[in-house]
Amino acid sequence: MIDSDESFTLVDTRPEDSYEGWRIHGAENVPFDPHDEFGDEKTERIEAASNGDSIVAICGKGLTSTPFGFELEQRGYDDVAVVKGGMEDWSKVYEVVPVETANEDLVVLQLQRRAKGCLGYVVGSTAAESAVVVDPTRQTDQFKIAAEEAGLAIERVLDTHVHADHISGGRKLASELDVPYHLGERASERGVEYDYEPLVDGETIALGDVEIETLQTPGHTTEMVNYLVDGEALLTGDTLFVESVGRTELQFGDEDAANGAELLYESLHDTVLELPDETRILPGHVSVTADNRYEVGSPGELIGARLGDLRDDLELLGLDEDEFVDRIVENDPEKPPNYERVIEINTGTEPPDDESEATELELGPNNCAA
């Protein structure tokens, strides 16, 4: 309904602070507790917001929006629907976007986790009928389905780094398929406590005639790597976005963020910006506003850019090193919710208690850009 021309009013029944922190664009906030009286004030707010449209109610998990819908029906509203799983299910909605490639044998699919702006990839060879998955999220079935529909068998799973904003699905997917799981060789320095196959700088993975080269790009994290796909696309993880660059204090801490910024500057200028202008940059995230809009582009459209365009348009890439470091350190965006706990999970030092905790930890947008 959100992407159609159908007219309706979306009512978010969560408390105001939850609504302000993360919501769907266009939603009207009418906080509701089933134990409280449904007074005239709520009715008036709904009448003002709906303007006669059908009403769709949403909450965190469907627990308050369902009785809210019953209350509306008792008051004469006959066109009321409820989002069954609430914002929790909204956080699991994906778009699959094909990437145009010069090599007809090369397949690149961008999987967009719409509510969080997480971007993962299926990269494969049509001739070899094989693929790797890069930066998968916990909803691993989405990646398996995308690969299967493209006629590709997943042979390996790769992460660009230890993520701080969401729980990686990398190990889970590799285990489900009994295939190798890879991180950059410096992941051991982050205290990673599970088995993985390290990729060294310059190491290449072949899928038939398609080659994926590992490039060390420390900065956002020390173990960060980018993956150069057949010389035409760079999967940048949290090194370079289409609207910014990666922040550095999530691993290094506020006191040592300058060290991370220096590493990031070197990675950008000595590695990423040394590539041809025609290289397509495919990032690991797109920033999402509190009301669930992409900072650049739109859901279902490719999030990416020519490196040459970013070189010209992204001010941060034109700064000298001192200016760059100062800008990164001075800029202090809100940290991702629960990022320290998420890092514990992604290094394997402290697994989630259960699926419920994992879901709660991931609610809300990502905040990995500087």
Question: Can you say where each PLM-predicted feature lies in the sequence?
Answer:
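Flexible, polar/low-complexity N-terminal or interdomain linker segments that lie immediately upstream
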Residues: 1-21, 91-119, 328-369
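Conserved beta-strand hairpin/beta-sheet module of binuclear metal-dependent hydrolase folds
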Residues: 99-150, 227-237, 242-243
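An active-site-proximal "capping" alpha-helix that borders the catalytic cofactor pocket
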Residues: 252-283
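Active-site environment of divalent metal-dependent phosphoester hydrolases
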Residues: 64, 141, 162-167, 188-191, ...
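Positively charged, proline/Ser/Thr-rich regional signature most characteristic
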Residues: 1-55
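Active-site HxH/HxHxD metal-binding segment of metal-dependent hydrolases
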Residues: 128-131, 136-216
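Accessory terminal helices/loops
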Residues: 18, 70-78, 269-280, 287-370
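Catalytic cysteine-centered active loop of the rhodanese-like fold, especially the PTP/DSP P-loop
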Residues: 30, 41-88
